Structure formats: structure tokens, C-alpha cells
Amino acid sequence: MTQNLQMADRFDSSAVEQALYKHWEEQGYFKPTENPSLPSYCIAIPPPNVTGSLHMGHAFQQTLMDTLIRFNRMEGNNTLWQTGTDHAGIATQMVVERKIAAEEGKTRHDYGREAFINKIWDWKAYSGGTISQQMRRLGNSIDWDRERFTMDEGLSNAVKEVFVRLHEEGLIYRGKRLVNWDPKLHTAISDLEVENKESKGSLWHFRYPLANGAKTADGKDYLVVATTRPETVLGDTAVAVHPEDERYQSLIGKTVVLPLANREIPIVADEYVDREFGTGVVKITPAHDFNDYEVGKRHGLPMVNVMTMNADIRAEAEIIGTDGKPLTTYEAKIPADYQGLERFAARKKVVADFEALGLLDEIKPHDLKVPYGDRGGVPIEPMLTDQWYVSVKPLAEVATKAVEDGEIQFVPKQYENLYFSWMRDIQDWCISRQLWWGHRIPAWYDEAGNVYVARSEEEVRQKHNLPADLALRQDEDVLDTWFSSGLWTFSTLGWPEQTKELKMFHPTDVLITGFDIIFFWVARMIMFTMHFVKDENGKPQVPFKTVYVTGLIRDEQGQKMSKSKGNVLDPIDMIDGISLEDLLEKRTGNMMQPQLAEKIAKATRKEFENGIAAHGTDALRFTLAALASNGRDINWDMKRLEGYRNFCNKLWNASRFVLTNDKLDLSAGEVEYSLADRWIESKFNRTVGEFREALSQYRFDLAANAIYDFTWNEFCDWYLELTKPVFANGTEAQKRGASQTLVRVLEKLLRLAHPIMPFITEEIWQKVKGFAGIDADTIMLQPFPKVVKSELDESAEMQIGWIKELIIAVRNIRAESNIAPSKGLEFLVRNVSDEQRKILAENDRLLKAMAKLDSVQVLSADETAPLSVAKLVGNVEVLIPMAGFINKEAELARLTKEIEKMRGEITRIENKLGNEAFVAKAPEAVIAKEREKMQEYQNGLEKLQTQYQAIENL
């Protein structure tokens, strides 16, 4: 016999998780080795914002990453999970600006650039560790000594190196072009930071008089121009029509007089114009509209910028040529009464002035999308500004080919199309931002306006042989955050130095990210990496071999989680639990829109009337893995979280059954393995195969389901029960067989589940390892189970599968006939094959114990059975004699109900098959299936009627 141990009744995650994690980290289990002969496996984490906190999307993606990292570590690979945080320029600057405004009533300008940046570093030091601590709570097996920040010295050097090299290659340039301008934050922003909001607006129809006596085809001396933006009229430099629009073909090349400004502008033909929109004539304002900007370039139109950086009307128009340089040969004056007007006040005045001049044709309601800055919260303005750009086309060609050639795989594959659609129509990338927080652009200016690009001011002076007394001013702008994060996979490994880590772990293996940043981050990483990182043969390296694109975690109603909706769930609250009061405070405190607080509080009280219970990290991780389907949207499900917490307890209780069993015998001596022992080993190996196959395809949901199904349905519900008769009445050899199988399968199951459920599996494994004769420190460095083909036993699976069906049939009869589970029954079977007869004989004791049977008897085909309740298991008839058990009235009532149900099904199928439309449209296989079901129901009805007759005759 083996000394059993004590185990608590329930798994207490709060007592285990943080202590275990601390131990793992202190022991260095998360660190890679320096052994270059081991195959390496590396994942670079998408760096979360340094001042942020974990949300469910982070928890979701990081659970999947850690599952892969732990699996590969157990596979014997040298694993590195490279972590770090992003400086998140605009987001972090805004957080600190709001903080000093609220606490001190100051702006960043009161501080000045240097002092304000120091303030951000202080804030980063204070709050920057939050997200790292939360990641530890998730169980992430990260080498924290390698944690990086995008503004660390090493990464900053990599950023400068890339900028300087691209500039030297002529791929970075400075130019005046149109950008998304946030007039509140005073910075250019990326397309990702623009949110298009549906709005009910107007379409104004203005009359532009034709110049020089020209007339339209129907005799009018004006064109009616449709616009949604009257405030930009003063910047018009043309009107456009479609070249094939017969209404206006005769006017192409002629001019109109621009009202209010009184200057002539040409009528141009361009296929961009939609003939069905408005009147088919549109104004072209290249300095204030992205589409017009492209039209202007095609037709060589000047660009007239009429707005200041605040989006007010300028005192004097800025006139730029298509080459981006000031144009002195074109005149465009702004009337005095417009100068200084705020843009929407200018809109009203333009409309009023057109009306006063008799040039307002009509105003129509119009649904439109208005672009807003997602952080400034005001409509963005397309604005002509001096910015730095990367000419990305040459980089994009190489990056596109890498995916076309299969060097990089997208999973699911359809996301390749999204990638290609962007890469094949890529525009130059505006990389400068008018912020203070970020990587300052490594460019310097002298008083004459000359620009010098280098890694430092010292290098500028040396490179260009500049005198020490020549004043140089560094560019005020910083780089787009995506520029530095685009270098993430290689800058974190020490590039531009050729470090051993870069050699060992690059390219990384998989990137796990959301579909929303394929353009903004994934594509740029591929472009930058392939341009700057080469293998020993000079071939461009990819940053990762696979991009696994996850869906978006939404709330239970399918809504996106957001602070303004008040439906954000904190993963730490899923782990530790939270009271209703604290949850309300979290959801309604410090809101940008306090008027929503009452509505949010009401919804929260309804959904979480008792707050949220603690579920532990393993239950959270298992839920996230089980939800990880290939869908684009994934709805969170509290019920599943509860279910998987119960699953953790099921695993704990199964382990208690094994390890506290005083009959467990692991002593030396003769061992006999039963059919059930062979069956559970075979089922375990099939589960290992399913898990490995699922994980190889990034189907974490199927991997989790394989573990769940085996643990709950096979190991706990059946195998543990099948061992009880052995421990009660088996031989010593049979008990040893059951004992060894229990411990062996439990230990392997813990290793199988460990990548998804690290804490509970380590806690139990530490108790199991002694029983299993394992001398090792941690489960995470144990080998991951492999499929052992010699343990696959189809015969055992078939036999136990059939025995299970017989037992279930008896249990169902007990339940339906209201017979106590402890009451012994006679068990009769008819229509069995010779093989089935043999199985019954060999497993007589097992069947009796599991189904609580007094006897097992096989009837011949013509042998009459006593009055019995019958069930069909395949073709085999299971009969339980009812003498002394049955309540005649109750049984007849039950049978009547069953007969009615069966007749209802038959009628339903008859109606279906009698429906000509269904029969005409349905595939033949579907019709055949319905007919097959009909036959089954008719056979079942016949048996029920026979049974009814027999009981009625009692």
C-alpha cells in the first residue's frame, strides 16, 4: 500500500497562485538557456501601453501566447517570450496632461518641454509597473529580466539607426502634404486614430457662375455644386465633372467664378466624380480634402490652405504648388469678415452669404460619416503641414512577396487578403507627430534652414564639418509610435548589434494579434524587419513565421467593451472577484461623460447584483482558450467562466480521489491491467493527439475542449467509477494495475493541461510526482505528453464504449421508472452477437457493480421476457423486469407521454416530406436522412405500444 496524503476539499486559487508564480520567477524557470544547439521558440508580445492596465483583449491574447510558450518549453525547445511596453505617445501624453490639469490647473506649456517630459517619466515610474504585475497574475511565463520599453536607450538607438539609414537611402523625406490633423491636440494623427461617426448632416447646393458668358447645355449661366463642407469654399481651386457626363462635356476646360473670393477657377474632368452624387459637379479643395488632394495632383492644381492649426480661418491663405513648395504666381485672398472665424462659424456665414447673393440653390438632408480624433474628440481636419514621410513602396513589395511565397502564414488564411489589399495600394507614411512625448526626430536645422539628419548633434557636426559656434536646433516633432513598435521583434533582441539573442531567437515564431492592427503594426514590422535584418546569406529575414489573428472579445450581448458603455470587464476581477460597490465605482468613477453614470450603474446592478465571484486564473485562462474560435467576434460568457471554475474543482476532486485513496497500491509485485485500464490509456493518447493537432492549427478552443471532454467525461465520470469495483473486489494484481493506471494517467493529464491551466496543475503535480516516482522540481520543465501508438487500443475502446451504453440504458430506466439507484435489478439482453456475449461474460462483475445489477442474463431470440421496461442499444434490446417495481398507472402515463412524443415526431417528418417545396429544394441526402429518422421513430413507436399493452395486461 502507498501512504496517502491530505488534500483540501476545494482548490483555493487565492492561496496558491501568487506564491507559486513568485517561486517560478525566483527559480528562473521562465528564462531561456544559452545552449545554441537546442531548437529555439520565441514570441514577441504586442507591447501594451506603459501607463495602461490589462483588459480582456490582453488577457485573451496573452493566455494563447503563454499556452504556446509553456507547450514549447515542455517540448524541450529553448523558449523566449519577449515582453515589454510601448511608450504610446499620444495616449500617455494625454493622460499626464489631464492629470496636471486636474491636480494643478496647469498645461504642459506651463511646464515647458523638458520639465513636462520628466513629469511623464515620473508617471511612467509610478504606474508603469501595473501592467507587468497584472501579467504576472495571469501566470505569464515571461523572462522579466528581458523586459523592454520602447524608449529604453537600446531601443531608442535602434530607432535612430533606422531613421538615419532610411534617410540616407532616400526613403525618408520631409514634405508638405495633407494629413489627418487634430485641431484640439495640435498633432497629425494616423488613420487608426480616426473614428468615423455617422452623422445627420446637409448637402448644400451652391451656384457657381460660369465665366466669360459660358452656358450649360440647358441654357443656365451657372453650375450647381454639391458640398458637405461650405467652410472650405474659399480654398476651392477647381470644380470637377465626370468626363463622360454629357450634361457638362461642353464646359470642360472653361472656368467658373468662385463666389465670395471672386477668382476664376477651372472646370476639370476627372473619373473620381460620381455622376449620381448631388448634381454631378463637385468643388475641388486640394488643401482640405484627401480625394481632392489626389485630383489636384492629377490636374496640377494649386493648394489653397485657408485654415490655421486651430481650424480657424486664416488671415492670409497659404498657397502651395503640387511640388509642396510655396507658389507665388497664384493669388487667393480671404475676405476680411472671414478672417479668424472658427470653422463651423465660417460654415454658417458661407451659407448665409451664398443665400444673400441668391446663389444658394437648395439644402438637402444628407447622412455622412464625420472623422473624429479618437482622443481629442473633435472632428479632424485634413491639413497641409510639413511632415516627415517614409516612402514605403519599395519596402512593401518585399513584404508582400514574403506572404505570397508562404514565408509568413496568416491564420485564419482569409486575413492575407486584408493584408494584400492594403500593401498593394500603399501610400507614403507620415511618421512625424506634433507631440512632446516620444522619440524625437534625429534631424537638426541651422538658421539658414538647412536640414541635417544623423544619430546625434555631435555626429551632425562631424559629418558635415560644421563649426562649433553654428547654432543647431533639433526638430521639435516626435515619431509616430508605430515607427518604434515596427522594430519590436529585432530591437528587443539587441539590433543593431549582432547579439547572440538576435541570432538565436530571430525570426520569432508566431505573432498573436488582432485584425484591427494588421495594417498599422503587422505590415510595418514585416517591412522594417525585412529591410534591416538579414540572415548569414544576406537574405531578408521575416519578423515571424506565422501571424495568428484573434477575434475581438465583446461583452455577452456582442457589444464592444468600452468605458463609455460601462461594460468593461477587468480580467483581475474575474480572478479575484469584486463587490458590487467596487465594480460600480470602477465603472462610473472618473468618467469622461458623467451623464452616462446612472444608466451604467443600473445595467451593472442588473447583470451583477452580487458583484463578481472569484474564479481563479486557471478558470479564466481555460475560458479564454475555449472561446478562441476562428470567429471575428467572440462574446464573453460568465456562465462558461463559472463552468470552468467547476471544472478546476472537478480536476482537484479527481486528484483527491486518487491521492487520498487508502486502497491505492503502488507496491512491487504482480500487475494485471483491466479492460478499463487499457481503455483509459487509449483514450488519453487519442486526447493527446487531438490536443497536438488543434494546437498546430491554432485552434485553442478545440485543444481546451479535448482536455475538458477527457477529464470530465472519460477520466472522472467513468474511469474513476470503473476502478471502484476493482478496489472493492479485485485481486492484488488487479488493484496494482488500477493504482498504477490512475496515478500514471493523472500525472500525464496534468502535463497535458498545464499550458492552459498552469497553477492548479503545478499544485496537484507537486503532490502526484512522489506517487509517480518522479524526481523533478516543476511540471513546466517536464516533457509534454506524446502519442504512444502502442497504447492505442481500439478493441478496449469499442468494448468499454458498449458497456457504457448498457450502463447508461439501465440508469435511464431507473430514472424514468423512479427506481432507487441502490436497488438491485435483473438485467436481460436480447439480440446480442457472439462477440457481445463474450464481452458480457468477461465483464459480468464490472457491469453488475456499475449498474447495480443482481443478475445478467442473455435471452435467445424467441425467448419470452417477463414484463419489462426496454431500451435499445444499437440493435441490442436491454430489458429490466418490472415485477415489484412498477407503479402501473405511473408507468402507463409515462408511456402515453412517450407515445405522443413519438407520434408528434412522425407527424412532423410526414409533413416535411409531404411539403413539395422542401422535397424540391432539399439535397437528396437530407431527404434520405429524414426518411431514416421516420423509420426509427416508427420502430420505436411499435415497441412502446407493445410495452404499453404488456403493462396494461398486468
Curated annotation (Swiss-Prot):
Residues 883-954 form a coiled coil. It is found in: Cytoplasm. Keywords: Aminoacyl-tRNA synthetase, ATP-binding, Coiled coil, Cytoplasm, Ligase, Nucleotide-binding, Protein biosynthesis. One of its GO terms (cellular component) is cytosol. It comes from the Bacteria. One of its GO terms (biological process) is valyl-tRNA aminoacylation. Belongs to the class-I aminoacyl-tRNA synthetase family. ValS type 1 subfamily. HAMAP family: Val_tRNA_synth_type1. The lineage of its organism: Bacteria, Pseudomonadati, Pseudomonadota, Gammaproteobacteria, Pasteurellales. It catalyses: tRNA(Val) + L-valine + ATP = L-valyl-tRNA(Val) + AMP + diphosphate. ValRS has two distinct active sites: one for aminoacylation and one for editing. The misactivated threonine is translocated from the active site to the editing site. The C-terminal coiled-coil domain is crucial for aminoacylation activity. Monomer. Its EC number is 6.1.1.9. This is Valine--tRNA ligase. A motif ('HIGH' region) lies at residues 48-58.
